[in-house]
Amino acid sequence: MLATRRLLGWSLPARVSVRFSGDTTAPKKTSFGSLKDEDRIFTNLYGRHDWRLKGSLSRGDWYKTKEILLKGPDWILGEIKTSGLRGRGGAGFPTGLKWSFMNKPSDGRPKYLVVNADEGEPGTCKDREILRHDPHKLVEGCLVGGRAMGARAAYIYIRGEFYNEASNLQVAIREAYEAGLIGKNACGSGYDFDVFVVRGAGAYICGEETALIESIEGKQGKPRLKPPFPADVGVFGCPTTVANVETVAVSPTICRRGGTWFAGFGRERNSGTKLFNISGHVNHPCTVEEEMSVPLKELIEKHAGGVTGGWDNLLAVIPGGSSTPLIPKSVCETVLMDFDALVQAQTGLGTAAVIVMDRSTDIVKAIARLIEFYKHESCGQCTPCREGVDWMNKVMARFVRGDARPAEIDSLWEISKQIEGHTICALGDGAAWPVQGLIRHFRPELEERMQRFAQQHQARQAAS
């Protein structure tokens, strides 16, 4: 995720005239955003059209799917790699590379694709919109992705609270079976592929890929130690790839339109279109598909109607779901919404769930509430997470009141650093990063609150 930037440079030989260089490459894009309607992949994001098979076919789903399957795994993987698609679940790992780990000679064990629809990150609801309004895109994506990695079946693990979404998805799967699009001889390609739905039971930790696999197998949803990785030993001990709903759902469109088309959006290494959730103190909260690398300010003002009270009323933004560090208004002015730009801004794209907070927000209380969430959802398997997040939760509760000393701010920072990177899964990191963002950008607010509490305490003592 924290990939280093590649600095690409070139120079002409001293004796060669520029006009004879023969350089016909197009100039790199410098502006991003304003995605055209014809370039949108998710055409029923707001549920204005029929989400069933008939409506999906009319919008281009399942078009030439048989041809895609017959071109074979290597061709599909090639298009996905050309597209530059990176995982849309948060980590941003190159999808083509990840899927290619499965495309190796079989050792006799079946291979499986597992789709992570256990969307429990606070502020995130992009996958829910796909499941609710465009389920056939996901079912078709399972088929294309499964073909790319030679999988026998797909398991879609859906969050337990998503009752209506699971119902719509099950209807879409049934329609696809009845139309011969999946199952035996899927789409008439000679390729057999099944799709199953597994309901979760409300545990946030099951969004972690190995905990999700454990849950599918009927065990407690606790993350596994890696290695072995799921590509070697996954669900039922078989090679498995776990992928995000959005990642899988865009793959058929990439294959139909071509990887170079998808790569034409966004910056280098941050290509494609992306679903963004915009919530909090905005005039029109929404989920929208936009070009990667769109400026954060443009995203909020164009699609969400701007910050309540105007842009100058903005305090901070959490750009990628609750587990990414917040950024203040000064950073929000110019930052681009992609993996690399947000890493440089000391945060992350995460799930691209933009949580906007205006000046009326008690920023300390808001972050404390997130830490309480992570404390509640920790599985307790790793000591740094089990003890450290609980400790952070108690310290943050005192910070909300101001009942602490300024030196404790550095202690809290140190606690977060001892949790980060020292756990089996990333839940510990997700709890540590919001605290780090708060301290990095709002230390004066913490110190002022502590000073105010101390003065009030002294006044009460003097009065008594």
Swiss-Prot record:
Q: What class of enzyme is it?
A: translocase
Q: Where in the cell is it found?
A: Mitochondrion inner membrane
Membrane-related topology note: Peripheral membrane protein
Residues engaged in binding [4Fe-4S] cluster: C379, C382, C385, C425
Transit peptide start and end = 1-20
Q: List ligand-binding residues for FMN.
A: 199-247
What are the Omega-N-methylarginine sites (modified residues) in this protein? R257
Keywords attached to this entry: 4Fe-4S, Acetylation, Electron transport, Flavoprotein, FMN, Iron, Iron-sulfur, Membrane, Metal-binding, Methylation, Mitochondrion, Mitochondrion inner membrane, NAD, Oxidoreductase, Respiratory chain, Transit peptide, Translocase, Transport, Ubiquinone
Sequence positions that bind NADH: G87, R88, G89, G90, A91, G92, F93, P94, T95, G96
* GO molecular function annotation: 4 iron, 4 sulfur cluster binding; FMN binding; metal ion binding; NAD binding; NADH dehydrogenase (ubiquinone) activity
Which reactions does this protein catalyse? a ubiquinone + NADH + 5 H(+)(in) = a ubiquinol + NAD(+) + 4 H(+)(out)
Q: What does this protein do?
A: Core subunit of the mitochondrial membrane respiratory chain NADH dehydrogenase (Complex I) which catalyzes electron transfer from NADH through the respiratory chain, using ubiquinone as an electron acceptor. Part of the peripheral arm of the enzyme, where the electrons from NADH are accepted by flavin mononucleotide (FMN) and then passed along a chain of iron-sulfur clusters by electron tunnelling to the final acceptor ubiquinone. Contains FMN, which is the initial electron acceptor as well as one iron-sulfur cluster.
What is the name of this protein? NADH dehydrogenase [ubiquinone] flavoprotein 1, mitochondrial
Protein species of origin: Pan troglodytes (Chimpanzee)
Gene assigned in the entry? NDUFV1
